[in-house]
Amino acid sequence: MMSKLGVLLTICLLLFPLTAVPLDGDQHADRPADRMQDISSEQHPLFDPVKRCCDWPCTIGCVPCCLP
């Protein structure tokens, strides 16, 4: 009985190797800074269309900043 289970386990591992299972480490990391570069500054909620720049804070990815 145990030898039959061993043979079955061996066949399963040969047919479906563990490397074929996707792991969490294989997924790309989420990069919010890269996503923010894809957004146009004119569509940013802090963009002032009259001044043609972004109000404070300037560290959230909206350029150009309105400097005083």
From Swiss-Prot:
Report keywords, A-Z. Cleavage on pair of basic residues, Disulfide bond, Hydroxylation, Neurotoxin, Secreted, Signal, Toxin
Q: Where in the cell is it found?
A: Secreted
Q: Which InterPro entries match?
A: Conotoxin
Q: Record's Gene Ontology CC terms?
A: extracellular region
Those residues forming the propeptide, per the database entry, are 21-50
Please give the residue positions where the record annotates the modification 4-hydroxyproline.
64
Could you say which residues form the signal peptide?
1-20
Superkingdom as given in the UniProt entry: Eukaryota
Q: Which Pfam families match?
A: Conotoxin
According to the UniProt record, which cysteines are disulfide-bonded?
53-66, 54-62, 58-65
UniProt note on tissues of expression = Expressed by the venom duct.
Q: Name one GO molecular function term.
A: toxin activity
What does the domain comment read?
Answer: The cysteine framework is III (CC-C-C-CC). Classified in the M-2 branch, since 2 residues stand between the fourth and the fifth cysteine residues.
Q: Which family does it belong to?
A: Belongs to the conotoxin M superfamily.
Q: What is this protein called?
A: Conotoxin TsMMSK-021
Annotated organism of origin: Conus tessulatus
Starting at the broadest rank, the lineage of the source organism is:
Eukaryota, Metazoa, Spiralia, Lophotrochozoa, Mollusca
